[in-house]
UniProtKB/Swiss-Prot annotation:
InterPro entries: EF-hand-dom_pair, EF_Hand_1_Ca_BS, EF_hand_dom, Parvalbumin. Keywords: Calcium, Metal-binding, Muscle protein, Repeat. It comes from Triakis semifasciata. This is Parvalbumin alpha. The keyword Metal-binding applies. Belongs to the parvalbumin family. GO terms for cellular component: cytoplasm.
Length: 109
């Protein structure tokens, strides 16, 4: 579970901050949830949890549920938020976010 890598308090704070549709900001979320400053291995571990189908990529459908990946209380992102998140992370434009792309997003947050 995510709490193996991140503090439950931080996760809850971050989920609460973006409970309203249309408010999601991945950079702020990564800071609030405590992902910034984690080791490469820990960031990879978070990526693997979010990669529900273990394909090596976080696809659009998985991005939509990214907050649920952190907490059962998370909401689905709306289409605009999902597409913005994908656009921000998908540097090779293949329609999904790989582990390296995810690590880069965290580093740039």
């Amino acid at each position: 579970p995510m709490t193996k890598v991140l503090k439950a308090d931080d996760i809850n704070k971050a989920i609460s901050a973006f409970k309203d549709p249309g408010t999601f900001d991945y950079k702020r979320f990564f800071h609030l949830v405590g992902l910034k400053g984690k080791t490469d291995a820990q960031v990879k571990e978070v990526f693997e949890i979010l990669d529900k189908d273990q394909s090596g990529f976080i696809e659009e459908e998985e991005l939509k549920g990214v907050l649920k990946g952190f907490s059962a209380h998370g909401r689905d992102l709306n289409d605009t938020e999902t597409k913005a998140l994908l656009a921000a992370g998908d540097s090779d434009h293949d329609g999904k976010i790989g582990a390296d792309e995810f690590a880069k997003m965290v580093a740039q947050a």
